[in-house]
From Swiss-Prot:
Homotetramer. It comes from the Bacteria. GO terms for biological process: inositol catabolic process; thymine catabolic process; valine catabolic process. The gene is iolA. GO terms for molecular function: malonate-semialdehyde dehydrogenase (acetylating) activity; methylmalonate-semialdehyde dehydrogenase (acylating, NAD) activity. Its EC number is 1.2.1.27. It comes from Listeria innocua serovar 6a (strain ATCC BAA-680 / CLIP 11262). This is Malonate-semialdehyde dehydrogenase. It is an enzyme of class 1 (oxidoreductase). Keywords: NAD, Oxidoreductase. HAMAP family: IolA (MF_01670). Catalyzes the oxidation of malonate semialdehyde (MSA) and methylmalonate semialdehyde (MMSA) into acetyl-CoA and propanoyl-CoA, respectively. Is involved in a myo-inositol catabolic pathway. Bicarbonate, and not CO2, is the end-product of the enzymatic reaction.
Amino acid sequence: MADVRKLKNYINGEWVESKADKYEDVINPATGEVLCQVPISTRAELDQAAVIAEQAFEKWSQVAVPRRARVLFSFQQLLIQHKEELARLITLENGKNLSEARGEVQRGIENVEFAAGAPTLMMGDSLASIATDVEAANYRYPVGVVGGIAPFNFPMMVPCWMFPMAIALGNSFILKPSERTPLLMEKLVELFSEAGLPKGVFNVVYGAHDVVNGILENETIKAVSFVGSKPVGEYVYKTGSANLKRVQALTGAKNHTIVLNDADLEDTVTNVISAAFGSAGERCMACAVVTVEEGIADDFLAALRTAAQNVKIGNGLDDGVFLGPVIREENQKRTIAYIEKGVEEGAKLTVDGRETGLSEGYFVGPTILEDVTTDMTIWKDEIFAPVLSVIRVKNLQEAVRVANQSEFANGACIFTNNAKAIRYFREKIDAGMLGVNLGVPAPMAFFPFSGWKSSFYGTLHANGKDSVDFYTHKKVVTARYSLKGYEE
């Protein structure tokens, strides 16, 4: 273990060895190999980064908006050039297959593209005449130092909807990546620096509780963006808000997919397999529950079981692999416990992913549990793994009632060609992101990303116009300019 590389924090444009007395292994979940070690940094290191970020903000916020945008555009170009390298890093430390990793890199690039539009996004409003000789203008200004807390499941896409936009709008940023997937951030830092970002504007501090609490408590940090589990998200929102910070916390999900009798069978099965088992189910937009109308249920489920049993499982770097590992051994054990709990509570296990035949890594195969009811633990909890619950329903109205009982409301999908059914679904379902005849309704960067109920805490969502509002505050100037002396 002596030759394992120890990662460093990135503060004021330099890689700085941590003062941490504890390091955690960063593991390739497909093999169990230790890739490097990440410091569990101290609160003092976070506070040091905050001082640096505040100093950098004073200068960066005064840089002309088009010039800031050019730095973001250069960053975007570098990301494109290094797309394959970035994708391989994601697969190495996260486990998702290379095709999915490439897709994640592309979504990250699109987020940077959106942020590069800062000159337009920063525009305010004005009214030439609100009274005699009086005009008003509304200006946007950056809020200051921003903190970001990112999850392991999208080590590029999620950070890239945080720091590029915040920085393009004139803020400085401190990011705490997941300690499980920190390697990719090293490369992003390198490329952002190469793009011309001044020292101190973007800082990275690895760690756990002390760093999170530092972000939430340090008075220099004015806003916090979080993506992760519901319990941590609640804590982040309550603690950050109590310390008078802006907070957006995107948390758990239990996304429902409704399959109606007129759905295209082959297309629906393909989409559900991808949505339920892609990225090992470790995404907040995964399909966790299918509610299927009785008329199509037998044919749909027979085809779904066959497709699930034919999924290729393995190392995401290998050709043809669809399903990679879950992130850690404890996640694997937790998932198996949920499957067994479902069977214990009366669900029918029709596709069993507990045994994959793979001797190394943390794998769980596609799992389907049928005859699920809303009082079961597997229906209530976010499992965050390739486990799909199935409920048969009589009609669309029942399917919507089932979905709306969940405490989560991130996304929901429907498969049908009935326009009336689609409209009913759109109006009645409780969820922030909806899909029609597609499995993962994750919107593009210029639309807001986030859910309702226990899937989100805050008022301003990630991405879209909401992100511009989140990272800026407004100043309205009302002025009187008498035209006396200029009369014709």
